[in-house]
A protein has these predicted regions:
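Structured adenosyl-cofactor binding patch, chiefly the S-adenosyl-L-methionine
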Residues: 26, 68-72, 86-99, 157-196
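Short coil/turn connectors at secondary-structure junctions
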Residues: 5, 24-25, 46-48, 73-75, ...
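Hydrophobic alpha-helical segments and helix pairs
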Residues: 14-56
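General small-molecule cofactor/ligand-binding pocket signal
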Residues: 7-10, 105, 167
Length: 196
């Protein structure tokens, strides 16, 4: 190509060995993944709307949250070190390209990070089965961070205690909770709607 991009045509067997999917699309690329600083994620000129993911294990959930976050106007994703790898091929596929546009940060101590958010005036809301208020009762027009926990165990006690407010998504029937990505979408779009 005229833009200087290098490419190479390889044999089908070689291509198959390079891919991690059974039915690859026929194009493979190697790119440098973006890296962000805490300041870049928190101070991008917009009122913060953050997702804090604590120990989510399913790469598909992480990718879906990132994709949905871009659509809902989220300004950054914060992930604990125990969260599924953002560079996992399944995560990247699930983002449908949003991973290249959504600022993210991987932190060693997510609880300490949440405490720093509060110091910056960002209100932290933990999605929690024991939430006192329905998510619809809160104001997300200011700096907001939603805390989402592990698919099987939810948020750790330390993370829930670090939050300023425990919120819940009301459930009908015998369902206790929603999938982490779906719960995240509900919260992100509530904030998006309040900010329109």
């Amino acid at each position: 190509p005229s833009d200087g991009t290098e490419y190479e045509v390889v044999d089908d067997r070689v291509f198959q060995a390079m891919c991690d999917t059974k039915t690859p699309q026929g194009v493979l690329s190697v790119i440098r993944m973006p890296h962000y600083t805490e300041e870049e994620v928190l101070n991008n000129g917009k009122t913060p709307l953050l997702m804090v993911l604590e120990d989510l294990q399913d790469p598909g959930n992480v990718g879906t949250i990132i994709r949905t976050a871009e659509g809902a106007g989220v300004t950054g994703i914060i992930m604990s070190r125990g969260t599924a790898d953002i560079f996992n091929p399944k995560t990247i596929r699930s983002t449908m390209g949003s991973v290249y546009r959504m600022p993210f940060l991987i932190v060693d101590d997510a609880v300490a990070f949440v405490k720093r958010l509060k110091e910056r005036g960002i209100c932290t809301y933990a999605a929690h089965l024991h939430g006192v208020h329905s998510y619809r009762e809160e104001d997300y027009t200011g700096g907001t961070a939603f805390l989402i926990g592990n698919e099987g165990n939810g948020l750790t006690d330390d993370m829930a205690e670090a939050a300023q407010c425990l919120i819940r998504i009301p459930m009908e029937g015998k369902v206790e909770s929603l999938n982490a990505a779906i719960a995240s979408a509900v919260l992100m779009y509530e904030a998006h709607g309040q900010r329109e």
